[in-house]
Amino acid sequence: MAPMLSIASRSPSPALIAPHASARATGLRAPFAGNRIVGWGWGDQTKSGTDRNRASICVVLFLRVRSGEPTQAPRDPPAAVGGGGCYVRLPAPPRDRDAVLYHVCLFTLLLCFIPITALAESDIKNLFALRKAIAVGKGFLHNWFELETPPCNWSGISCVGLTVVAIDLSSTPLYVDFPSQIIAFQSLVRLNVSGCGFSGELPEAMVNLQHLQHLDLSDNQLGGPLPASLFDLKMLKVMVLDNNMFSGQLSPAIAHLQQLTVLSISTNSFSGGLPPELGSLKNLEYLDIHTNAFSGSIPASFSNLSRLLYLDANNNNLTGSIFPGIRALVNLVKLDLSSNGLVGAIPKELCQLKNLQSLILSDNELTGSIPEEIGNLKQLEVLNLLKCNLMDTVPLSIGNLEILEGLYISFNSFSGELPASVGELRNLRQLMAKSAGFTGSIPKELGNCKKLTTLVLSGNNFTGTIPEELADLVAVVLFDVEGNRLSGHIPDWIQNWSNVSSISLAQNMFDGPLPGLPLHLVSFSAESNRLSGSIPAKICQGTFLQILRLNDNNLTGSIDETFKGCKNLTELSLLDNHLHGEIPEYLALLPLVSLDLSHNNFTGMIPDRLWESSTILDISLSDNQLTGMITESIGKLLSLQSLSIDRNYLQGPLPRSIGALRNLTALSLSGNMLSEDIPIQLFNCRNLVTLDLSCNNLTGHIPKAISHLTKLNTLVLSRNRLSGAIPSELCVAFSRESHSELEYVQHIGLIDLSRNRLTGHIPRAINNCSILVELHLQDNLLSGTIPVELAELRNITTIDLSSNALVGPVLPWPVPLASLQGLLLSNNRLSGSIPSGIGNILPQITMLDLSGNALTGTLPLDLLCKESLNHLDVSDNNISGQIPFSCHEDKESPIPLIFFNASSNHFSGSLDESISNFTKLTYLDLHNNSLTGRLPSAIARVTSLYYLDLSSNDFSGTIPCGICGMFGLTFANFSGNRDGGTFTLADCAAEEGGVCAANRVDRKMPDHPFHVLEATICCIATAIVIVLVVILVVYLRRRRKMLRRRQFVLVPAGDNAMADHETTLSNNLLGRRRMKKREPPSINLATFEHAPVRVTVDEIMRATGNFDGMHVVGDGGFGTVYRAELPGGRRVAVKRLHGVGRRFQGGEREFRAEMETVGKVRHPNLVPLLGYCAAGDERFLVYEYMEHGSLEDRLRGGGGAALGWPERLTICGGAARGLAFLHHGFVPHVIHRDVKSSNVLLGEGLQPRVSDFGLARIISACETHVSTVLAGTLGYIPPEYALAMRCTAKGDVYSFGVVMLELLTGRPPTWSSAEVTAEGDDERGGGGSLVGWVRWMAARGRGGEVFDACLPVSGAEREQMARVLDVARDCTADEPWRRPTMAEVARRVGAIEAMEYGPLVVAVSSGEPPAMP
């Protein structure tokens, strides 16, 4: 056998090993200098034919010492030496004169191969070891497991000679611990394993990679502190560790990496201060540390980084000021310090960085103004100062930024006008100045910015008209001036904007007629203005119009022909106008999804053709003058999901064909004249969630088939003529089993059968209504006892059984009913005494009405002092004993009782000074009892009283003087007491000696006569007193009016008594006329846990710094949110609504009614409304303050790294349940209308809570109204309404789908063309929207690449992500009917949260590492 030379193999790269025919073997020539490689081949030696895993690959080289024809390669490879290996076959030794030369060459060959042999053999073994360690990636590393592929030809492996110099396994989903075999390749120069899903910690043996220059470990799950050995790799030039879970402090040893040009460690959990040693890296060009937990100030040593081009430190906890030494970074191109805690002014030195192209300082605690020197940054393309607490005026020098493309200055507190110099920004494409504090007029110079595509000036105080010069902005796509004070006509020239797709002019003071609209307009919103006249037909001259919102104006005329040309119209919202005529039939031919004609003057019958529409999902025709019957044709509208025709004049029976509407979820026909029995076919609509047929003339029994409506959670049949017994089958729909898909902590279930003629007993099966929250059976003919089974309803908050014929005890159950807040049992035949332990049985009781029964005994001690009780009525009973006003001495908190009526009983004894402890009492009625003694002066210290009736008792003595100073008191009656005296407050004022003389009940006139002089003096004195009294009264009345303007009561929504206290009072205390006794105002406190909190406007002003921008924490579609700390230390969020005083003009009760409804919403995934205020034109809402900010902040500006997949999935599930509760669980159902990540707030433990639903359009039950409607947010708007807001539940579903995609991808809902250029071509797909981009990627088979690279996921978690992505894509379907309901979304996400992990089903490829400068 010819001599063999063993060669350790490192897989040659394709460039070094050529096919046999080409004879390229240049990489192997060096060891054979002066010789010629004449051929090569591959051998495969195994111990058996089936043992393929132990195959070894050999290189066969055929050489010839002398020049000449190459030796022929053998037909078969020789047997391997030693059971395998690689070899070189040499020709046999010559027999002639070349023998000496032959042996010399052979010796030289051996010397050259000896060092390479050992190294190559080691690398080959390491490659096979590495392959074994990552065998899970066999499906992605195909040629690693192909026998015919040399190791150096394996994908991602690069060799020089036979030595491995580069490993690139990026975007290969392996999901194993970091393979230690990698560190065995000692000649490695480049290592890229980004996006491999590696976990664990880096080994200290990293020090072995002494030749490493490029290290990319991004997009994995690696954690722990960085090993100290990493900083000994002194040849390292690029280190990329983004999107991992590394923690600990950044070691000062980083100063050893003096060759470093790129350091990118973003989106980890590094903490502590930035080491000053970073400033010693003189070659550093790219530094990215964003989204970590670095704290402290920016080291001054950073000024040494003179070569730095890119510095991104956003989303950390950096404090201090922006260091002045930053001026030394003369080559800086991008600076991003956003979302930190930086303070102080923007340093002027920053404006010396002449190469700066992008400056992002948003979301910091900066102060001062934008420096005048900002105009020196001539290369600036992006200036983002959003939410920086900046004040003063915007400098004129802003106009010097000639190539600026994006200017973002929203959510600041600028003063004055937007400078005219902004018109010099001829390259400006986006101007975002929302809620920035600007006043004055919109600068006409903006018309020079002809490249503008986005102009957002909403939420300011701009006045005047829209400048004519803006007509030149023909490139504009989005124009938003909502929520200002703009006036005048909407200009006609807007129809010349050929590229605009969305125009929002809502909530201004525009008047006059509607103009024509641009041809390519998709969305037009002009609600809440003063537009008048008829709607012109030319409004439909464009063929792209999909959404038209003109509600809350003064539009008149009919719509007989108006919208015939709107061939793509999907939403038409005309509510709250003065339109008349009949509803036209052509509406059925339009692709409408939502039609809202409520609150107009439409007459006639509902056209039958409307029921033939193939697209419509929601119809609202409430509050018109429609007549006739609902015909059987309604059964043709199979797609219908919601129908509301409340408060019209419809007659006749409900059509039987309504049972064909199997998709119907909400049916509300209250306030009509419908008659006859409820058709049994109605109960075929098995998706019904809300059924409201109240306020009609329906007769007959409640059908037992109601049990078929298993999804029902709202049933309102009140104010009809229904008779018979309450069917026990009713509770099938309200059982936990029927609603198991929505695991609400607080369920919502409403049964309202009040004001009918129902008889019999309350069914004992009521305990099966386990999701029931409110039960209203008042005003019927029910008999028997209160069923003890009510105590099993653990979620019940309100029970109203008043005005029936119930007998027996008040509380038949001894166990606590912790959730019950309102119990109304008045006007029955209940007997016995009030249990002494009632406070323990009803621990959360807020309203207790036991009046009009036959109760005896005494009032339990401490009942009046119970911390939760606001309203107590025990009038018209036979209760005796003393009224227990005295509380325990250790009670320090204010007594929350607001309303107390104990009249017409047998109470005795006297009132003592302890009544002064009831500082919140507004209504006190104790008339017709046997109370004795003197009236305590302490009663005058209950300054909140406005109704006081102590008549028909046995009081004696005087009326306390202090009562005359109770300016809030509007009714007081002391008549019918001892000695027959009849005294009113007018008597108090008219008594001798001034306002408060000793006016005893038994007082008699003096006997002695007056002398003439004395009489004269007395008359003069009396006249002076009268004049002074008149002056005092005028002063006090004016002061009182001022106080009314300045003071309000923070009312837990639902508290009508307190709301009535806010209304203007018609009588003053000094008795200009005597008020007649009136019924106490109705109140509803039953759904609130806390007593009202009294604050004044002044206190709110102080708490918000006079609504200073520094207190702004956000801005919603209808107002600005301020952080405030009330007296007593409670932190709240105060939402100051924009321009809604006019909206509720003449209807404060309407505003209150809406807030009453919203205030009842309580769910752990919703931000609760604590109170509200209507003071003049101001409207304030007070919410619980959420310390941890919003989901948007966490994902893009405040800690996204802290949100791993488990946290994101929990947020997704919780938010879904909150929205599902609004859609399906609360009555009246609430459509959010502005679902977005900034409206998902994070509470303790990152518990998600959906906010801003309090301003959503409310679809109410019997006594509802139509309320304000929020505008949606760009990027979250469903396609059927283009860039505007939706008013259907399916619109909320679409928006929530976008939020789900944000959670999955970490991307914003939209991005600009400038951002696309920065990111790369992949970002162009989808047209700049997140939904479009996900579809674009999926269509190209790259769906697995959409996930956020920073998500720390395992294989099982990746499957969860894939399933959530499926749900999100269903939610964002173009067709609304293809989208699931929120109930279904919550169920599916809940199932994903609880899923058992199966095999990995989705392969994920992360994106490329960040581009290096």
UniProtKB/Swiss-Prot annotation:
LRR repeats lie at residues 185-209, 210-233, 235-257, 258-281, 282-304, 306-329, 330-353, 354-377, 379-401, 402-425, 427-449, 450-473, 475-497, 498-518, 519-542, 543-565, 567-589, 590-613, 615-636, 637-661, 662-685, 687-709, 710-733, 745-769, 771-793, 794-817, 818-841, 843-866, 868-890, 918-942, 944-966. It catalyses: L-seryl-[protein] + ATP = O-phospho-L-seryl-[protein] + ADP + H(+); L-threonyl-[protein] + ATP = O-phospho-L-threonyl-[protein] + ADP + H(+). The active site is at 1234 (proton acceptor). The keyword Transferase applies. It is a single-pass type I membrane protein. Belongs to the protein kinase superfamily. Ser/Thr protein kinase family. This is Leucine-rich repeat receptor protein kinase MSL1. It comes from Oryza sativa subsp. japonica (Rice). The lineage of its organism: Eukaryota, Viridiplantae, Streptophyta, Embryophyta, Tracheophyta.
